[in-house]
Curated annotation (Swiss-Prot):
This is Small ribosomal subunit protein bS18c. The gene is rps18. GO terms for biological process: translation. Belongs to the bacterial ribosomal protein bS18 family. PROSITE patterns: RIBOSOMAL_S18. Residues 1-20 are annotated as: Disordered. GO terms for cellular component: chloroplast; mitochondrial small ribosomal subunit.
Length: 78
């Protein structure tokens, strides 16, 4: 009996979530919304594919934007 050859899975290189020119800032609402769930929760570092430093900066920026009422704390639109 012949064995089937093992196929290698090609790993697609994913693009970084934040482009080199983008700055994480509480005023950049389009960028902040990409890292929030539909319910308004901050997504984890593993899901976002951010570095630890970027995740900390993103969390602080989202919290500042929430306090200034630029983005809602919860998104309960049903």
């Amino acid at each position: 009996m012949k064995k089937k050859p093992i196929q290698k899975q090609r790993s697609r290189r994913r693009l970084p979530p934040i482009k080199s020119g983008e700055k994480i800032d509480y005023k950049n609402l389009d960028l902040l919304r990409r890292f929030l769930s539909e319910q308004g929760k901050i997504l984890s570092k593993r899901v976002n594919r951010l570095t630890s430093k970027q995740q900390r900066t993103m969390t602080i920026a989202i919290k500042r934007a929430r306090i200034l009422a630029l983005i809602p704390f919860l998104n309960n639109e049903n």
